[in-house]
Each structure stands twice: as structure tokens, then as C-alpha cells.
Amino acid sequence: MTASNDGLASGLSFDWARPSVILGLVTLGAHLVANGNYDFFRDELYFIVCGQHRAWGYVDQPPLVPLLAAGSYALGGGALLAFRLLPALAFAATVALTAEFVRVIGGGRFAQWLAGLCALLAPVFLIEGVLFSTDTFQALTWLGLAWVLVRLEQTGDERLWLVFGLITGFSLETKYAIAFFLVALAIGLLATPQRKSLLRPWVYLGALVAAVMVLPNVLWQHAHGWPFLELGRAAVNGKNAVLSPFDYFAQQFLQAGPLGMVVVLCGLYAGIVRPRLMTARALAIAWLVLFLIFVTQHGKPYYLAPIYPALLAFGAQRIEQWLGKAVARGAALVSVVVLGILMAPLVLPILPVDTFIRYQQMIGGTPPSTGERLKIGALPQYYADMFGWREMAAKVAEVYRSLPAEDRMRAVFFGNNYGEAAAIDIYGRGLGLPPAISGHNNYYLWGPRGHDGSVIIIIGGDAGHYAELFASYRVAGRIDSSYAMPYETDQPIYVLYGIKAPLESSWPEVKHYE
């Protein structure tokens, strides 16, 4: 039996020499080295706080990631490396299953190595393997759905739609973005002979499984006025950068890596031109649909990334057919590795920060865009937002302790965004600070927490605006961090006294969903 036929016929069996096993272990090892460097990212702090306020949903995400983040933080004793173990494991599994998926669709060892290496070294996945975020499980679950569709096509076992439903339900509990993939995938399936399977009862049983899993979150969103839809409108109408179709496509070469994107394009070609499996065509069409959706709706460039592991697999299989000579295959693998290693420090925190800045300048590297309208400093946003939070909390604590005892009893920190508020809630506990308040995203729902607004500590903002809203104010300190985002550094710390409108009644005015 050939390697190709073996890949189509067999299931998973463990073999230490398999590319999937080796690449998965290398991925995990690299992230165990890197993930403890720098510090907690803005969103990670926020997810921990959200998870400590357990609920069936949140303004800006489903419940599972905050729950896992808070659990990881507690079990790891607040250690950064322990906290980021789950992202590392999820990414290692994604890389391993990308290589294994190649085997399942009939690819040989070269194709397995090529697809796995491209996934391992894709900039977008390297950083997602670091940060605990709503994207942590996206590539893994989207690949899981593609895997199920392939096995459905190969075996005809319609009970696999139940597995499809389980994966979908899990993914929806981590991020709603898979809904776009499901729509795009349905359009892709309708364009293939597989459309007949969409009428089978097992499809609807699988959908029922997913619906039951996500129902509590849907009910929570309904009870709170569908805040996630309001958040989505804010992203479309201003938060996210507007990219032309050409610029959005060009960004994909930074997300997947230049050579990785070439393999993805080969996967699209393989799906459109005489595909061996109709799932490949459905995925190619799904990519086109997703591209149109995200360009027109101002989606961030990395929103397309979760579909890439499956396309890498189909692309690598097609390249394997084209490159018959060992020399050509070896050159392809070496090229992917060399270029990937050169780009890795741009998205993997393996260098001391000053060394990273010099390295970035030396190679002229452009980190992948986060897709937001933000002024960037010396570091890309995903690194910059790991710095300055502890120092900020310490400065706020100094201001808080300098207040007279009577004022301290009434004082509260108001965060202009959830990053500031979460940093106070996480780092301020040990410094004697009370829980923070904010109007940003889920902090708005937690309200003023019993504070009347008579003494508020706040960072930055418009002093003239404060003069209108409060009886008096003063500058009590300053925050400064060389590496933080520009709008989070070199800012005054104000103490505001005597709010003119009661905080409880004016709270709706601070609502800020973004």
C-alpha cells in the first residue's frame, strides 16, 4: 500500500517519527521557551478579570476563554508561563494536526513536512500560540471542521455530523467568528456534490448539538440587549482600519508568511482545479467568501487565518505532485525554515526587548497588522501591550496612598479602557487598591460598584472636560513606560473631586463598547 493510500485509509496511530509528532513537539518546546517572556498582555488581564466574574456571556466574547483564563491564572499561581500553557498546547496541536491532515487527504511525508512547517512558522499562529485570547482555539477548531468534512466524504459516515456539531459548539463558546466560516462553508458545499449531504437528518442533529451548547450564551446576549452586535457595529464603523481588497490580500502574506501564503494559494488552486476531494473545493470557495465578507465589513487581516491550516494541507499535497526531485523538495523546506526563523522574533518574544527593536530595524521586518487604527511606538501593538501595566498600577497606588484617609475611603480608579481597569484589578490587589471601574465593554455592566464619584483617580484625558464635570481636580502623578503603547505612556494621573451629577444616574453616559 502506498503512503498516499495509507493516508486515505487509515486513522490516527502514534509514531514518534511522524512529521506531525516531531513538529508538534518542536512547536510546544519553542513556546515553552518564549511564552514566559515580557508580561501579561492587555486582553489577558481583562480575560482573567472577566473569568473571575463568571457569567454565561460577556459584552465582547463568549464565556469559555475568560473561564479558562481565570482558571489558568489561579492554577498557575499567576505565573506567566503557566498561564500561557493552554495557547502553547492549542498551537502545537494545530501544527501537528495540520501535518496529520495532509496524511489523511493522501499526502506523503514531504507534503506533511511542508504544511506543518508552514503552520509552525506562520507569524499569525506564532503570536496566537503566545497570547491567551479568543483566537487561541480558532485555527484548531476550523481545521477540525475541515477534517470532519474530509472523513465524511471518504467514509460516508453521517454520524460525523455530530462531531461537527460538537466542534462548532465549542468554537462558538470561544469566539463567534466561526459563524462566518459556517456561512462561507455552506456556500462552498452548495457548489459541490456534497450539497446533498446538507439535507440529511444527521446534519440537523449536529446543528442541534451546537445550538444546545451555545444556548445559555445566546440567552445572556438577549437578556443584555445583544451587546456583541453593538460592539460589532463599532468595529465596522471606526475602530478597525479600512483596507482595500489589494491591501487586505497583501496583509495575508504577513499573516501566513510569504512562502506559507504561496502554499495557501496552491491550496486554493488545488480546490478549484480538478480537486481529488470536493472538500478542497468547498474550502477554496469558503476562502473567497470570507475574503469578501472581511474586506467589505472591515474585518482585521488575521480573521482569515483560521482557514489556512486546511488550505496549507491541500496546497502542500499539490506541490508534492509538482516537485518530484529530492533537491527541489529539500530546497522548498529549507526556504520555509530559513525565512520563518528570520521572521519569528517579530511575533515570538524570544529576544530581550531592546535587542528585538534593533533586530526589527536591522531586517526591516514589518510585523503583521492587528487591523486597528492605533498609533504604534517602538514595538508592535501585540508586544507593546505587554508592558507598563505593573508600573501603572504602582503609580496609581502611590497616588491612592497619598490621599487623606477620608478620601481614600471614597476613592476609586476609573479606567479609560479595560486594559487600565484590569491592570488595577490584577496588580492593584496586592497594593491595597479597591476594584476599578470603567465604562469599557464588560466593565460597564459591572457598574460603579457602589462608588458615588466623590473621589476618582484617572489617567490622562481632557482637563477642561474634568473641570465641567467635577468641582475640582489636580494632577497627582504621571505614568511613563518606554515600551507601552503611546496612548498609555507619558500621561498625567488626575484626582477628580466632587462629581456634579451622581455617578449612579450618569453611568449610562460612560458606556463605551468597542
Language-model segments: what does each one mean?
Residues 85-106, 144, 148:
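Transmembrane-helix motifs of polytopic, lipid-linked glycan transferases
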Residues 3-4, 8-21, 98-121, 140:
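Transmembrane-helix signature of polytopic, membrane-embedded enzymes
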Residues 170, 181-280, 294, 344-355, ...:
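Transmembrane-lumen/periplasm boundary regions of multi-pass, lipid-linked membrane glycan transferases
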Residues 124, 130-138:
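Short acidic/glycine- and proline-prone juxtamembrane loop motifs at membrane-interface regions
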Residues 148-169, 200, 204, 208, ...:
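Short hydrophobic alpha-helices at membrane interfaces in multi-pass membrane enzymes
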